[in-house]
Every structure is written in C-alpha cells, then in structure tokens.
Amino acid sequence: MDIFLQQMVNGLTIGSLYALVALGYTMVYGVMRLINFAHGDLVAFSAFIGLSVYAQIFGESVTSLIAVITVFIFTAAIVAVVGVLLERLAYRPLRTAPRLSAVVSALGAGLVIQNSVMLIWGPNMKIFPSNLFPATIWEIGGIVITFTQVMILGLSS
C-alpha cells in the first residue's frame, strides 16, 4: 500500500506539471484560435534561461528561497519578452491569413527556438544543481514527500 500511495504522490507531482503546460496550450488556443506548436519549446527554453540566470547571479552555490524567487522573476521576464517577440514576428502578421499559415509559422518558430537553444547551450543535457532547493524530506506513514514536490504542487495549484 505504501508503494501505491508513494506513486500517487509522484503522479500528482508530474501530472500537475503536465496540467500547467496544457493550461498554457488552452489559454493560447482560447485567445488566438491557434495551436501554438512552439509552446513546449518555450517551456524548455525557459528552463535553460533559468539555469543560466541561476549560474550567472548565484554561481550555482546558493540555496535559498530568495535565489529561487529571483531566478523565477528574471526567467519569467526574459521568456515574456521572447513570447511577445514571437507573437509580433510569427503570429500577428498572419492573423488574417489561412489557418494553415499560422500552424506552419508556429512549427517554424518552434524549430527556431530549438536550434537557438542548441546554438547557445549546446546539444548536451544540462542539469539543475541538486542543491537549488532545500533537501527537506517529510516521511508520512512510509510515504516520502520532498520539498521540491511540495513546491511544484503548491505553485501549480
């Protein structure tokens, strides 16, 4: 039973991240009537931006809530600017064009973002420092809940 409950906690954590991405797709489609195929690329781009902001400001050695909030604010601002540029350059000129044109533009924007990430950060995987968040662990009846899981669930709800 402990394994089942542990996997429920793990599933809720991952599912809440998927729900945030799906919410982004839904919001864009609701406003623009366009499936933004570059949305996932922007999510990945924001992770690389966050990692770079953390390394530049804190040197990968600071573990505090202030550091996490600072990285989040800087990352959100940078990705918001990129999102506005994407909308102005790739989507707005095609508002009156056929839907297929906007879909092709979204696919192209995704490719540009992917290749820009590979050009800037390289093709190899990058890993966030494990000390970014406190290593606090709560054990409740055999179920292990980490600080990161609590933070993900709290921010996504």
Locate each region found by the language model.
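Small-residue-rich transmembrane alpha-helical segments that form helix-helix packing/gating elements
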Residues: 1-34, 38-157
